[in-house]
């Protein structure tokens, strides 16, 4: 009987661990800069998101697809219901033409709540 109660208690504990998670929800996952001048210098966009889960959300890393994009993000845990940000800065120097770059956002979000890796995008057209 003790084994049955112990097994049942452990099952409830494990289930409760997996039922709690953080959940990142972006207002939009892509930004179009439109036409930008190469001589105009770097351009930036601030992606806003909300933690729709019931546990704190932590952005572990933001990995750009190339060296032309520099990310900055909320470093502190985002409490449930609160908002955070990721800023994507693009350097158009020496890169004329159409572009579309991704940023891989890695969070502490539960793997069950796929995806753990989220992608956001910036795009535009660099004019000389």
What are these regions (language model features)?
Residues 86-94:
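Short, hydrophobic beta-strand segments
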Residues 52-55, 94:
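Short, acidic/polar linear motifs in exposed loop/turn regions
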Residues 54-83:
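Surface-exposed binding patches on compact interaction domains or structured appendages
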Residues 45-51, 88, 103-107:
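Buried hydrophobic-core signal for structured, non-transmembrane domains
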Residues 1-23:
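Bacterial Sec-dependent N-terminal signal peptides
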Residues 38-39, 80, 95-96:
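Surface-exposed loops/turns
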Residues 96-127:
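Terminal connector regions
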Residues 19-46, 52, 126-128:
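Beta-sheet-dominated interaction scaffolds and their linkers
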